[in-house]
């Protein structure tokens, strides 16, 4: 870690200290804040580029607005590291995304300066509008400021909220952090002058006087005058879209120029009417050359060398499940021109950047628009194509109605690739994929698979391409596989059939695993057998349709049956329990059945291994579960590993 010299930042305990600084000191504070952010993320890893892009904006907002009394909401949330440093959390900033440390996103439980938790995009304007209305109903005085950017304006929810806010005429301030200049670039001094002019009280007062005068004119003249004024401002500023939604538009402004930012923010702070949208143009990675040169690579980083920018990546023992999926899909697409791929603004995260390099015309990135992605895939499936819709488990939640109504109800063969299923490590509870088994396996006609290793994923990809009888899904975790050899071409698996991978199918205990918990089951089985138990281990492969024959065989042939899955209650284990109760096996006391699932809590950031241990889903927990069912070891051997 570099020994930084940050004399001005060292005087900042919270945002009140930022407000006490004279304006001519803010540029120095921003420079020191940027250096501190770079150094901290080099130690912990995390989201770097977005935070560097809003350093000046963060300083300006805390200087102008009376936070935390004024509500400041960040969206997506991962650009909040500079905000955390200025709001009393600098002493813990090098615990970002670590067990027991600061969250990588805003979090209500962490600080009063985080009025709303945000890790999924495009929620800020809706939440901010709710806070603004609550303020008005309570007769309070405060500003509500929503900072939205980093692609979040590609999601429909943001426009739904803006439409509502405009119709309600609520006093709400939205800062559009445009960090790819997708709408309009700032044009130097003229742009800054216009932004300052039209955000000021004089212009807004004259505008209101003009409206009152126009109100006494014939309606067609009044409408014409309003359109002319809107056109004139829209011509110079490019904000017509936001004006049509009912927002007063200001900008674009250079988001790295404090002399431009501060007067505009003061003007909108003091405005008595709203809503107002301030369009700020920033650069991701600003002030750190490697991040400026490669915004995509430095969006999210592991630990890195500050001087060179080189990221310290651990050597892989096996390919990631994401890569195995992508390479398998490419292989399948060579033989089937109907295979197409869809992602919602996550091409590199889902591996579809690799597919897109080979088949760009068959790859579709629809933006942060999961609802649209699913129904878009449904339309492709309706016309005979084979769409693979690749989403993180946590983001698939945003499109559940489309999964049910547009896909499952119509029996359309959309293939869902569910990445980051289960616990995800440093991104914590907001990005965990705990619920997909439960909310998919309950749907009629849905097929849900989970591979135990890389080879199984290759086979499941072949199965999905061949399966046209309805929607299907495969879920796999973040991170590397277990290192097994992958077949060149996958085999089509029989739908709804599992396999016994260890044992005879009869004995004291049967462990029935869904997905990658199979390795922990095999580890537990080895220790249980050393202690004198006879153990069968089976890989279910499918949560739905359930392999009834396999489940009933295991239940009939063992004194106890334990299911293991990296998912919430209501998933695979619940379906197994439903079957054995329907068959009356529990009535007769023929078998003891237990389901091992994620606990009914949100599990905070940690390493994945520690999260699994805390969740009670590692080999130690499986052994303990069997010990509780069947008693101590038969052979007098310890069931637990030494050390």
Swiss-Prot record:
Organism: Xanthobacter autotrophicus (strain ATCC BAA-1158 / Py2)
Gene (UniProt): dxs
Cited InterPro entries: Dxylulose-5-P_synthase, THDP-binding, Transketo_C/PFOR_II, Transketolase-like_Pyr-bd, Transketolase_BS, Transketolase_C, Transketolase_CS
Cofactor(s) the protein needs: Mg(2+); thiamine diphosphate
GO biological process: 1-deoxy-D-xylulose 5-phosphate biosynthetic process; glyceraldehyde-3-phosphate metabolic process; terpenoid biosynthetic process; thiamine biosynthetic process
Catalytic activity: D-glyceraldehyde 3-phosphate + pyruvate + H(+) = 1-deoxy-D-xylulose 5-phosphate + CO2
Keyword annotations of the record: Isoprene biosynthesis, Magnesium, Metal-binding, Thiamine biosynthesis, Thiamine pyrophosphate, Transferase
HAMAP family linked to this entry: DXP_synth (MF_00315)
Protein name: 1-deoxy-D-xylulose-5-phosphate synthase
Keyword Magnesium: yes
């Amino acid at each position: 870690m570099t020994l930084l010299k940050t004399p001005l930042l060292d005087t900042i305990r919270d945002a009140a200290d930022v407000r006490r600084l004279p304006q001519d000191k803010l540029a120095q504070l921003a420079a020191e804040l940027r250096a501190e952010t770079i150094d901290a993320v080099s130690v912990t890893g995390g989201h770097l580029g977005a935070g560097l892009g809003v350093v000046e904006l963060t300083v300006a907002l805390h200087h102008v607005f009376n936070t935390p009394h004024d509500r400041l909401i960040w969206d997506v949330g991962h650009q909040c590291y500079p905000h955390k440093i200025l709001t009393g959390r600098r002493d813990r900033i090098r615990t970002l995304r670590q067990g027991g440390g600061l969250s990588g996103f805003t979090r209500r439980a962490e600080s009063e300066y985080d009025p709303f938790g945000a890790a999924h995009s495009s929620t800020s304007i809706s939440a901010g509008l709710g806070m603004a209305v609550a303020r008005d109903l309570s007769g309070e005085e405060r500003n509500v400021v929503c900072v939205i950017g980093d692609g979040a304006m590609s999601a429909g929810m943001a426009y739904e909220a803006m439409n509502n806010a405009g119709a309600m005429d609520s006093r709400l301030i939205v800062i559009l952090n445009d960090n790819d200049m997708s709408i309009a670039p700032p044009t130097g001094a003229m742009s800054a002058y216009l932004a300052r002019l039209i955000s000021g009280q004089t212009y807004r007062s004259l505008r209101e006087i003009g409206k009152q005068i126009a109100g006494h004119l014939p309606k067609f003249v009044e409408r014409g005058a309003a359109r002319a004024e809107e056109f004139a401002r829209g011509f110079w500023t490019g904000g017509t879209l936001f004006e049509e939604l009912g927002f007063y538009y200001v900008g674009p402004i250079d988001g790295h120029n404090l002399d431009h930012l501060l007067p505009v923010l003061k003007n909108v702070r003091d405005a008595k009417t709203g809503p107002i949208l301030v369009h700020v143009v920033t650069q991701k990675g600003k002030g750190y050359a490697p991040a400026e040169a490669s915004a995509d690579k430095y969006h999210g980083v592991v630990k890195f060398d500050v001087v060179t920018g080189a990221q310290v990546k651990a050597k892989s023992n096996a390919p990631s499940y994401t890569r195995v999926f992508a390479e398998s899909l490419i292989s399948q697409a060579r033989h089937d021109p109907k295979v197409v791929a869809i992602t919602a603004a996550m091409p590199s995260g889902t591996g579809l950047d690799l597919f897109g390099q080979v088949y760009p015309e068959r790859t579709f990135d629809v933006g942060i628009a999961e609802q649209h992605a699913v129904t878009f895939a449904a339309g492709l499936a309706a016309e005979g194509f084979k769409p693979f819709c690749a989403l993180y488990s946590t983001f698939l939640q945003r499109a559940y109605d489309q999964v049910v109504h547009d896909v499952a109800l119509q029996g359309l063969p959309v293939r869902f690739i569910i990445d980051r299923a289960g616990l995800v490590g440093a991104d914590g509870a907001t990005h965990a994929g705990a619920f997909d088994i439960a909310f998919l396996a309950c749907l009629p006609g849905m097929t849900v698979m989970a591979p135990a290793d890389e080879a199984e994923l290759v086979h499941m990809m072949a199965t999905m391409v061949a399966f046209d009888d309805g929607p299907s899904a495969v879920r796999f975790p973040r991170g590397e596989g277990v290192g097994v050899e992958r077949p060149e071409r996958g085999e089509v698996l029989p739908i709804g059939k599992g396999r016994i991978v260890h044992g005879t199918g009869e004995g004291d205990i049967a462990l029935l695993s869904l997905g990658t918990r199979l390795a922990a089951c095999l580890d537990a089985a080895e220790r249980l057998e050393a202690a004198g138990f006879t153990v069968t281990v089976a890989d279910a492969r499918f949560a739905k349709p359930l392999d009834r024959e396999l489940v009933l065989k295991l239940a009939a042939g063992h004194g106890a049956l334990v299911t293991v899955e990296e998912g919430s209650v209501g998933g695979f284990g619940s379906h197994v329990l439903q079957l054995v109760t329907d068959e009356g096996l529990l009535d007769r006391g023929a078998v003891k059945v237990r389901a091992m699932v994620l606990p009914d809590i949100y599990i905070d950031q940690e390493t994945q291994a520690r999260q699994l241990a805390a969740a009670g889903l590692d080999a130690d927990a499986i052994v303990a579960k069997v010990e509780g069912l069947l008693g101590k070891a038969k052979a007098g051997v310890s069931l637990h590993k030494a050390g």
